[in-house]
């Protein structure tokens, strides 16, 4: 009996030791794989160049008219076809592992006007396995040690030099891969090949590929394949893409957007399959017939069909990208009519926004740029605009001259300050009963900026002109009061970047002095100080901090307008990635002009896996969540506090806020923004 007990104990101990040893070895192997890139990342070259071949096959299984509203999908409706193919050969230059410049040498496409499509899916062909984010827009990489807590791993030893690591996400969320496997070298930890599945931004995908074999190329795929399924508004598409990197032949930069098929045949690393050849043959047949009937159809091109496809489609429902012949100038215009640019704010109601950008490179260190931002608030029936033009004469030292013209919110004069001072209890404030005088505000700004200490200390100077006119001019005339006011104020601003402007930490101070010259009606001195910092945490988390104060030193004139640069209402709410953090969502807009000083503090915590993420089903579609906390001190309202919670999904973003002061509760408010196809 004693012998049996001893034998049993030895077996248990031996099994435990073997199990522990195997588990430790699994950890060691996983650690070796995750740390493999460190020697290369610490000595990363300034740039990497890759000759890349890309091909794609798109098949429409089900479609309806809403397909036209999906970015780059409009042209798939043009010819009534259901299958499309394109291939390209290009030179890609990778800078700092993030910025990629692409020179497209050859493009062959059966899509209308030789377009490419689904660029957001094409990005999945370049997974950054060793980065926190697998792709540019998201998804936590299972090879990053900081993301390890979100995945379960298993290891299978194939032989003395090879092993397979399988992984699966611990919860279903769009920021995590569902499952996958890695073929790795047991000795070095190098990933030989990979395979994984996931779903992000309405794209369900399966990716497989092989990694490079030597040096820093082992951090990147040498070839990659993706199969994706896209379902949206009743439309269903399948898209297959293949990419081959580091090909030996480099074409001269003078060859761009060529349609030379013979040249492509000599460069293509793999043969086209039967389906792809059939699509090309059908496309050539249709083109041949079109050329034969060109004379007959030329007159018909001015009809309604031509207008819908070429005028309405290209300019109203589709993003417009225009380049000059020398490729130095570019114009980018968002769709003129697109319901996806609608937003909602509890105070302004429904809003619509529009954005146009353009630029021209003079040299590598100088350029012209311009931007037009428009927004329409339906509840107020008001159009807001900002026109900005800039001449960058020294980009390396952030040297530029900028002109800006804009109209903002209706503003009240300093009489509101006098009214507020008479009130003893904030609960008794009735803004409507004050009969405040409202003014339209037109703003012009000229600024000169230059980094005195490169990337650390910048100085901006210029002047600001405000032209304010009364909304009710007849009432001013009857009262014998001036209905138009103008201010001319030179300013100087200093920005300090303690860690250089490559890091999100900046302190800014600005002094503004209004003078009674050039038609100015009054004088004032104003100071503002502002500090902003974003602390990036592991796993796509971040903590944003902002604090500031402002005050008027001197005010002289018939009337005054208390108007701050860093404490004002954003009159057109944008999406998740704009100014959701650092704003006061429930504060009555009259308070922005009712105090001759302010102190503010804003804190925002962002994480892809926070609260709702852990809820069944709903947590699957949550991309990121935020917690907000803001505090404000102004005349008669100190302290005022807002707290809120927000989240964004593939379709929309939403924020819920509440605000209160020691003697008053502001209630609750919501903010909505459409994020559909934001990353497409």
Predicted regions, residues:
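C-terminal outer-membrane beta-barrel translocator/porin domains of Gram-negative envelope proteins
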Residues: 400-418, 428-434, 501-502, 506-609
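Residues that define the transmembrane beta-barrel architecture of outer-membrane proteins
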Residues: 348-352, 381-385, 440-444, 482-490, ...
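Gly/Pro-enriched, hydrophobic low-complexity segments
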Residues: 155, 160-259
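Short loop/turn motifs that connect adjacent beta-strands in outer-membrane beta-barrel proteins
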Residues: 320-333, 346, 361-369, 394-401, ...
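Residues on the lipid-exposed face of transmembrane beta-strands in outer-membrane beta-barrel proteins
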Residues: 352-358, 387-391, 446-452, 463, ...
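Outer-membrane beta-barrel transmembrane strands
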Residues: 346-348, 358, 431-465, 499, ...
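Structured extracytoplasmic
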Residues: 22-162, 169-176, 239-344, 435, ...
């Amino acid at each position: 009996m004693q012998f049996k007990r001893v034998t049993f104990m030895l077996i248990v101990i031996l099994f435990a030791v073997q199990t522990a040893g195997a588990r430790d070895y699994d950890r060691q192997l996983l650690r070796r794989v995750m740390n493999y890139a460190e020697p290369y990342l610490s000595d990363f070259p300034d740039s990497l160049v890759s000759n890349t071949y890309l091909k794609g096959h798109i098949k429409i299984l089900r479609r309806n008219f809403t397909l036209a509203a999906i970015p780059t999908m409009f042209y798939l409706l043009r010819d009534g076809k259901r299958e499309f193919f394109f291939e390209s050969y290009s030179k890609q230059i990778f800078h700092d592992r993030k910025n990629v410049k692409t020179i497209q040498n050859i493009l062959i496409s059966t899509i209308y006007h030789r377009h490419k499509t689904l660029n957001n899916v094409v990005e999945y062909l370049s997974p950054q396995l060793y980065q926190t984010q697998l792709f540019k827009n998201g998804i936590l990489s299972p090879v990053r040690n900081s993301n390890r807590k979100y995945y379960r791993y298993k290891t299978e030893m194939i032989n003395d030099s090879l092993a397979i690591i399988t992984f699966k996400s611990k919860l279903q969320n769009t920021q995590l891969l569902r499952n996958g496997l890695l073929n790795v070298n047991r000795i070095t930890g190098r990933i030989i090949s990979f395979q994984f599945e996931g779903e992000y931004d309405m794209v369900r995908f399966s990716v497989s590929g092989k990694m490079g074999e030597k040096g820093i190329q082992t951090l990147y795929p040498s070839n990659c394949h993706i199969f994706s399924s896209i379902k949206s508004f009743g439309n269903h598409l399948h898209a297959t893409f293949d990419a081959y990197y580091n090909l030996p032949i480099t074409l001269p930069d003078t060859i761009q957007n060529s349609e030379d098929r013979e040249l492509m045949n000599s460069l293509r690393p793999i043969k086209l399959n039967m389906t792809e050849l059939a699509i090309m043959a059908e496309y050539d047949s249709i083109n041949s017939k079109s050329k034969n009937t060109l004379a007959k159809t030329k007159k018909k091109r001015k009809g309604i069909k031509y207008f819908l496809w070429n005028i309405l489609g290209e300019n109203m429902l589709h993003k417009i990208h225009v380049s000059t012949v020398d490729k130095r100038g570019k114009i980018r215009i968002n769709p003129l009519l697109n319901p996806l640019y609608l937003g909602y704010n509890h105070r302004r109601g429904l809003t619509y926004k529009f954005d146009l950008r353009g630029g021209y490179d003079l040299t590598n260190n100088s350029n012209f740029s311009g931007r037009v931002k428009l927004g329409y608030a339906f509840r107020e029936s008001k159009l807001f605009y900002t026109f900005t033009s800039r001449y960058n004469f020294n980009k390396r030292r952030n040297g530029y001259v900028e002109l800006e013209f804009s109209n903002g919110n209706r503003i009240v004069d300093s009489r509101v300050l006098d009214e507020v001072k008479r009130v003893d209890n904030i609960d008794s404030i009735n803004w409507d009963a004050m009969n405040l005088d409202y003014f339209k505000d037109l703003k012009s700004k000229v600024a000169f900026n230059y980094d005195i200490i490169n990337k650390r200390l910048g100085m901006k100077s210029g002047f600001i002109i405000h032209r304010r006119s009364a909304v009710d001019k007849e009432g001013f005339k009857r009262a014998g009061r001036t209905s138009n006011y103008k201010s001319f104020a030179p300013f100087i601003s200093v920005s300090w970047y303690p860690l250089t402007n490559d890091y999100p930490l900046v302190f800014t101070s600005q002094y503004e002095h209004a003078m009674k010259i050039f038609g100015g009606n009054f004088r004032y001195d104003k100071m503002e100080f502002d500090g902003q910092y974003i602390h990036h945490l592991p796993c796509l988390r971040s903590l944003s901090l902002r604090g500031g104060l402002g005050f008027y030193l001197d005010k002289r004139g018939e009337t005054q307008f208390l108007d701050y640069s860093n404490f004002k209402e954003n009159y057109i709410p944008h999406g998740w990635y704009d100014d959701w953090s650092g704003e006061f969502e429930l504060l009555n807009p009259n308070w922005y002009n009712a105090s001759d000083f302010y102190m503010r503090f804003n804190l925002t915590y962002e994480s892809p896996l926070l609260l709702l993420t852990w809820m069944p089903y709903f947590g699957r579609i949550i991309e990121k969540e935020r917690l907000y906390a803001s505090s404000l001190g102004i005349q008669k309202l100190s302290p005022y506090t807002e707290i809120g919670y927000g989240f964004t999904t593939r379709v929309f973003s939403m924020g819920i806020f509440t605000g209160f002061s020691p003697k008053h509760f502001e209630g609750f408010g919501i903010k909505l923004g459409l994020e559909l196809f934001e990353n497409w």
